[in-house]
Amino acid sequence: LDAISEHYLRQTAGELDTYPRGVTPREEVWRAGNVSLLRFESPEGVEGQPILIVPSLINRWYVLDITEEVSFIREFAQKRPVYLIDWGYPGAEVGHLPLSHYYHRSIRRAVRFMCREHGCDKVDMLGYCIGGTMAYAFSCLEPDMVDHLVLLTAPIDFRDSGIFGTYADHFPTEEFKQSMDFMPGWLLAFSFNFVQPMGTWQKTKMFKDKFESKGFMKLYNAMERWIADPVSYPGKAYYHMLTELYKENLLSQGKLTTAEGLLVDPAARRSKALILNAGKDHIAPLCTTQLPQSDKAPVKQVTIPSGHIGITTGRNSRDASKSALEFIMN
């Protein structure tokens, strides 16, 4: 499926296909179906407790490594060993897997591998968007495996989740469950355009104003390449995300359970957490990033004046990555 996706991308992306998916050198250290674990290159002598990055299931991971100048991963790898879970290009073959397969089994396997490699019993973790939701759920299920937890624009409390909550409330989830093995990536990408209908116009205007800047064009083209690389969402996992998280808000209420019946209990979390949210976020509004009242573990919050994507690639992204790294290192 990865090869098919690559062929499709070459046909549709044109010149953008020549842009790399992530700029920091890396190697794949294990793979299970679509899911793989990547280890990024660090300067000689860099050691310490490894960091696991859990990206969103809804788009490609390399928004966190978009150019040499704008990269969470590159900055982290200067200080610590860095790993990332690459969800690949899921299709019908994984449509039967529940959401907990990703937020528990897959993350646990990655953490165990890292602990064996580095002789440690826990790791530091950063989760972005729904990847942050999954990282948080994992920290509640396996509290002894996570030391520092950075929740980067991660929705946890879905009571007032804005336009995406409205979308989930009106989405025909039961009909989807009966008829679809996955939510097509192209349809998800198309839907996002309607969330901010003026976004394309604003982007075009920005291009007109700044196209003579080489730095701007490098980032602009890299971002367009990322946008042209959509990811499908596994069917059962998508159903669980809409019903258990958005519609029923089970995670925040301490009622979410895995497919095996394990309770995702916020009161069980013991890791030190940083809520790193974005003041202009329309995907994960500030209120959705707050932790449940039953979660009494240490937590601090830093709000960056940017949007959901801008916090990783915009002018304030360096402030965000610096805040995350300082939290982990301290």
Ranges and model annotations:
Residues 125-127, 152, 276:
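Short beta-strand immediately N-terminal to the catalytic nucleophile in serine-hydrolase-like folds
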Residues 116, 120, 135-236:
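Alpha/beta-hydrolase-fold enzymes
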Residues 15, 22-91:
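Short, surface-exposed "cap/lid" segments of acyl-processing enzymes
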Residues 126-131, 135:
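Gly/Ala-rich beta-loop-alpha elbow adjacent to hydrolase catalytic centers
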Residues 269, 275-277, 281:
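Short beta-strand/loop motif that positions the catalytic acidic residue
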Residues 97-117:
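Alpha/beta-hydrolase active-site loop
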Residues 282-288:
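Conserved alpha/beta-hydrolase "acid-adjacent" motif
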Residues 283, 301, 306-321:
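Catalytic histidine-centered segment of alpha/beta-hydrolase-like enzymes
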